[in-house]
């Protein structure tokens, strides 16, 4: 099985399965000399881990990260950094009934016909459990980007099922299990999820993620554009079915006189481009949104076939997220951080000595509201 590595200079290779003894990542290309401890990584893992509210899977995993290599006396050495997260709450018996069947919407059918053999326990390699080492690896990238450029990341839920979640203030994001930047809508979201669970069904979500203080010049035309690599990474998140950069699909209904972001000596007037121009970062805030499909593992009976091609009815058991989007915010932040880290090192390698007499304009004009 290939396709387990992301990045060119800053690479992350994940390993493990949902119900194996452990999952983890090997991070290669991290510059030496950065202070790094397990505590630096754990905070983001705690934001992603399961069992944190009644609205997500009740699988209890502490997701405690162990640094196995690449750090000596509290500093990165430049060697590959090995990260390990042990699985402690597997219930593989919940998946005995699906060994010979295919769950609608899951990777079961495609994995079976690609590999001829699959691990059905919790989805095996296709499980969202494998996003934990991605988040762990990205904590390293976030730290380096913060120290060198002041880059900051935050994400939030923009929509849960049919309910749009208007942005109110990012201070609310850490105050609720939905990562919603709106405190007033939480009771409605909780009621919606309670009804969804009673119905044995699931829903999708829209997640917004932002990065500020991104240096100008990240991205490589033509086929390694920054936004192209962001989309590639975001589509690597389980259940993601769509990616938008900036105005995204709203660009279709915009006119050029509106969509083009005017430049002024005191800054950009708007940010429909989402922080990239020609696939290269403009210095503006990077704005990305992802669409996450409804969870495929539901209690509602669904039609399917078994491995012999015979018709069956599937009613999924086990512990599952009724909306995987609820825990997706730190994962989306992680993917964005990994792409930026990789491109930052690539830009530094090729264009690190480029100097211009005229400094760049500010990311936004004073007092402007960039929507």
Curated annotation (Swiss-Prot):
PROSITE patterns: CHORISMATE_SYNTHASE_1, CHORISMATE_SYNTHASE_2, CHORISMATE_SYNTHASE_3. Transmembrane segments: none annotated. FMN binds at residues 125-127, 238-239, 278, 293-297, 319. Its cofactor is FMNH2. Disulfide bonds: none annotated. Keywords: Amino-acid biosynthesis, Aromatic amino acid biosynthesis, FAD, Flavoprotein, FMN, Lyase, NADP. Its EC number is 4.2.3.5. SUPFAM superfamilies: Chorismate synthase, AroC. It comes from the Bacteria. One of its GO terms (molecular function) is FMN binding. NADP(+) binds at residues 48, 54. GO terms for cellular component: cytosol. Belongs to the chorismate synthase family. HAMAP family: Chorismate_synth. This is Chorismate synthase. It comes from Polynucleobacter asymbioticus (strain DSM 18221 / CIP 109841 / QLW-P1DMWA-1) (Polynucleobacter necessarius subsp. asymbioticus). The gene is aroC.
């Amino acid at each position: 099985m290939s396709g387990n590595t992301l990045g060119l200079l800053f690479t992350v290779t994940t390993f493990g399965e949902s119900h194996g003894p452990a999952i983890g990542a090997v991070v290669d290309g991290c510059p030496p000399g950065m202070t790094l401890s397990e505590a630096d990584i754990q905070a983001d893992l705690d934001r992603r881990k399961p069992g944190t509210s009644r609205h997500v899977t009740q699988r209890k995993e502490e997701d405690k990260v162990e640094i196995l290599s690449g750090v000596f006396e509290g500093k990165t050495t430049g060697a590959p950094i090995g990260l390990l997260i042990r699985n402690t709450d597997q219930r593989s018996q919940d998946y005995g009934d699906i060994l010979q069947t295919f769950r609608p919407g899951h990777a079961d059918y495609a994995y079976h016909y690609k590999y001829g053999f699959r691990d059905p326990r919790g989805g095996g390699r296709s499980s969202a459990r494998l996003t934990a080492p991605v988040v762990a690896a990205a904590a390293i990238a976030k730290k380096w980007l913060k120290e060198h450029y002041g880059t900051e990341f935050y994400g939030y839920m923009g929509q849960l099922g049919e309910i749009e979640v208007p942005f109110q203030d990012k201070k609310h994001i850490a105050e609720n299990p939905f990562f919603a930047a709106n405190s007033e809508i939480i009771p409605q979201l909780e009621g919606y999820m309670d009804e969804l669970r009673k119905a044995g069904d699931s829903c999708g979500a829209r997640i917004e993620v932002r990065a500020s203080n991104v240096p100008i010049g990240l991205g490589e035309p033509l086929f390694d554009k920054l936004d192209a690599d962001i989309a590639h990474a975001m589509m690597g998140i389980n259940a993601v079915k769509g990616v938008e950069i900036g105005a995204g699909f709203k660009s279709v209904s915009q006119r050029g006189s509106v969509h083009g972001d005017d430049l002024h000596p005191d800054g950009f007037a708007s940010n429909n481009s989402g922080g990239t121009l020609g696939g290269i970062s403009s210095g503006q805030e990077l704005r990305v949104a992802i669409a996450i499909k409804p969870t495929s593992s539901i209690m509602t009976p669904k039609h399917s076939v078994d491995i012999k091609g015979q018709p069956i009815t599937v009613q999924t058991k086990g512990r599952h997220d009724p909306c995987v989007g609820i825990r997706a915010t730190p994962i989306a932040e992680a993917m964005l951080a990994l792409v930026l880290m990789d491109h930052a090192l690539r830009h530094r390698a090729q264009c690190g000595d480029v100097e211009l007499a005229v400094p760049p304009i500010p990311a936004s004009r004073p007092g402007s509201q960039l929507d």
